[in-house]
Amino acid sequence: MNNQIFESVDHYISDLLGYEDDALLAATNSLAEAGMPAISVSPNQGKFLQLLAQLCQAKNILELGTLAGYSTIWMARALPKNGRLITLEYDPKHAAVAQKNIDRAGLTSQVQIRTGKAIDILPQLVEEGAGPFDMIFIDADKPPYTEYFQWALRLSRPGTLIVADNVIRDGKVLDENSTEPAVQGARRFNAMLGANTAVDATILQMVGVKEYDGMALAIVK
């Protein structure tokens, strides 16, 4: 089997179950318009995150890595009216684009964008007592994933779901000699996850329009 069949099946599934309305399509289109990288989750992955948030009955969600707000919109739509989502974005330009997309989706009152380095904002959230969060989605720069996860634990409660994207890196995580920072970060994260007694966890391989990668899912004990 080749990548083409995986992409075709991905489109087949999204046509049936991953419907994108005008707000989601606009968020996708805003990437090219703003000269931003096309690295958002796919429609099927967005729907998957939304379903996970619903399964958690999440009222309080934390996201690391906003980009244009595409995954933010998917997850925020799973919140009850009194729910909230805090999303962290390093690049002010990206945050501004995301804010427009979130406003267009009618989620202004539920979503707060915090701009700056996640590794700096996470301790602030702990100090503010912003947690515990019901669901935490990590989709930011890969080298500090392990540190992000440790802070995520401090912002969690028993039962919190922590999801981390891009942890397979097209299978490159099998190469222990890789010098790519993102691969090294993913390998370190995956090894930590396998040894972490504070969570029950697994990793799902994923193929499709985003090619070959994977998501880690961990439930805090």
Swiss-Prot record:
EC number, UniProt record = 2.1.1.6
Q: Which SUPFAM superfamilies match?
A: S-adenosyl-L-methionine-dependent methyltransferases
Q: Which reaction does it catalyse?
A: a catechol + S-adenosyl-L-methionine = a guaiacol + S-adenosyl-L-homocysteine + H(+)
| Methyltransferase as UniProt keyword | yes
Has the keyword S-adenosyl-L-methionine been applied to this entry? yes
Q: Could you say which enzyme class this protein belongs to?
A: transferase
How would you summarize its activity regulation? The metal ion affects the meta and para-regiospecificity of the enzyme as well as the enzyme activity and thermal stability.
Q: Which residues, by range, are in coiled-coil regions?
A: none
Q: Report the SS bond pairs.
A: none
The record describes how the cofactor is bound as: Exhibits highest activity with Mg(2+). Also shows good activity with Zn(2+) and Cu(2+), and lower activity with Co(2+) and Cd(2+).
Recorded GO terms, molecular function?
metal ion binding; O-methyltransferase activity; S-adenosylmethionine-dependent methyltransferase activity
Residues annotated for Mg(2+) binding in this entry: 139, 165-166
UniProt superkingdom: Bacteria
Q: Where does S-adenosyl-L-methionine bind?
A: 41, 65, 67, 71, 89, 94, 118, 139
What UniProt keywords are attached to this protein's entry?
Magnesium, Metal-binding, Methyltransferase, S-adenosyl-L-methionine, Transferase
Q: Which cofactor does it need?
A: Mg(2+)
Biological process GO annotation list?
A: methylation
InterPro entries for this protein: Cation-dep_OMT, SAM-dependent_MTases_sf, SAM_O-MeTrfase
In terms of CDD domains, this protein maps to:
AdoMet_MTases
Known partners and oligomeric status: Homodimer.
Name the job this protein performs.
Catechol O-methyltransferase that can use various catechol-like compounds. Can produce vanillic acid (meta-form) and iso-vanillic acid (para-form) from protocatechuic acid (PCA). Does not have a regiospecificity, and produces the meta- and para-forms of the products in equal proportion.
Please quote what the entry notes about the protein's domains.
Undergoes conformational changes upon the binding of S-adenosyl-L-methionine and the metal ion.
Which family is annotated?
Belongs to the class I-like SAM-binding methyltransferase superfamily. Cation-dependent O-methyltransferase family.
Protein name, as recorded? Catechol O-methyltransferase
